[in-house]
């Protein structure tokens, strides 16, 4: 199936069938979907980071973004559906937000079985902000000489290298400056601030 890239809308198909065979026709369903950030990784590229650029004003990953964003955003809430004669149905998730990183759409369909019990089935669809996924590998995450070596690669959403893809790498230097202040009673406190310098284009090709 086609991998969704920067979709504004996402159509999902449903098929409800009896265990003995044949579709469950004219059955009422309820569709719910959750959009949540996903960690991009590919076999053979474990040393590369595929994370989007961080906000330079944020000191660590735990502070970046709202915790509710990590838990997910409800993009479809108990939409009423009905299967056709063959047990098929479909629904479309509209107005998806602009993506800055890979996300998963967790879709759930609820229905009543012949015994009246509520049953739920689910599927997960990976959606991407771009058809090109950039990865960055640093030779080391610490440097004592003011220099850092890194490798950049471009993959498609299935993890295959893209030949001839133009890439531009920009850099930022973030420095945390701590100032010690003497408090009442002889105690000390530290005031930390982060200064960010734009290094511009580091390389392109």
PLM regions with names:
Residues 1-205:
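A structural signal for beta-strand and strand-to-loop patches characteristic of beta-rich domains
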């Amino acid at each position: 199936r086609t991998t969704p890239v920067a979709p504004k809308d996402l159509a999902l198909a449903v098929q409800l069938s009896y265990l003995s065979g044949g579709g469950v026709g004219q059955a009422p369903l309820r569709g719910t979907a959750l959009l949540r950030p996903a960690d991009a990784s590919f076999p053979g590229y474990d040393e590369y980071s595929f994370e989007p650029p961080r906000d330079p004003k944020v000191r660590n990953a735990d502070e970046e973004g709202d915790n509710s964003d990590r838990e997910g955003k409800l993009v479809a809430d108990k939409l009423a559906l009905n299967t056709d004669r063959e047990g098929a149905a479909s629904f479309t998730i509209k107005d998806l937000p602009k993506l800055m990183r890979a996300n998963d759409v967790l879709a759930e369909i609820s229905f009543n079985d012949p015994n009246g019990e509520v049953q739920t089935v689910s599927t997960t669809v990976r959606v991407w902000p771009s058809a090109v996924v950039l990865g960055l590998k640093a030779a080391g995450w610490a440097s004592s000489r003011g220099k850092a070596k890194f490798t950049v690669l471009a993959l498609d959403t299935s993890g295959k290298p893209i030949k001839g893809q133009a890439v531009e790498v920009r850099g930022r230097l973030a420095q945390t400056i701590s100032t010690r202040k003497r408090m009442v009673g002889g105690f000390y406190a530290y005031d930390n601030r982060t200064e960010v310098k734009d290094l511009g284009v580091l390389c392109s090709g």
